[in-house]
Amino acid sequence: MIETIASKLLVQNVSQYFILSFILLGIGLFGMMVRKNLITILMSLELALNSVNIAFVGIDRLNHLIDGEIFALFTIALAAAEAAVGLGIILSLFRLRKAENVNEIIDLKG
């Protein structure tokens, strides 16, 4: 009896992780599609990546393994490096071309 109640609560908690993950993923994808500012697009991308991390932790809690948390930490480190490179590119574009929006970057030629 107690085991079934505990398993129902665990499934309910895991479903809450996935609901939160899908909401954050939707907000991140919406921000990437609608916004024109490069920094806002980068923040939306980070939000979408963090939603995937929440899903990894939810899967980890369901299976009682630590693999999801390790993968989430690895993804956080990778996202930090990606954000640093992205901000560097955005700052150099702003310094050289005064380009803040995506529409101003489309005209760049290599």
UniProtKB/Swiss-Prot annotation:
It is a multi-pass membrane protein. The chain crosses the membrane at residues 14-34, 39-59, 70-90. GO terms for cellular component: NADH dehydrogenase complex; plasma membrane. Its EC number is 7.1.1.-. GO terms for biological process: ATP synthesis coupled electron transport. Keywords: Cell inner membrane, Cell membrane, Membrane, NAD, Quinone, Translocase, Transmembrane, Transmembrane helix, Transport, Ubiquinone. Pfam families: Oxidored_q2. Disulfide bonds: none annotated. It is found in: Cell inner membrane. Coiled coil: none annotated. InterPro entries: NADH_UbQ_OxRdtase_chain4L/K, NUOK/Mnh_C1-like. One of its GO terms (molecular function) is NADH:ubiquinone reductase (non-electrogenic) activity. It catalyses: a quinone + NADH + 5 H(+)(in) = a quinol + NAD(+) + 4 H(+)(out). Belongs to the complex I subunit 4L family. HAMAP family: NDH1_NuoK. NDH-1 is composed of 14 different subunits. Subunits NuoA, H, J, K, L, M, N constitute the membrane sector of the complex. NDH-1 shuttles electrons from NADH, via FMN and iron-sulfur (Fe-S) centers, to quinones in the respiratory chain. The immediate electron acceptor for the enzyme in this species is believed to be ubiquinone. Couples the redox reaction to proton translocation (for every two electrons transferred, four hydrogen ions are translocated across the cytoplasmic membrane), and thus conserves the redox energy in a proton gradient. This is NADH-quinone oxidoreductase subunit K. It comes from Hydrogenobaculum sp. (strain Y04AAS1).
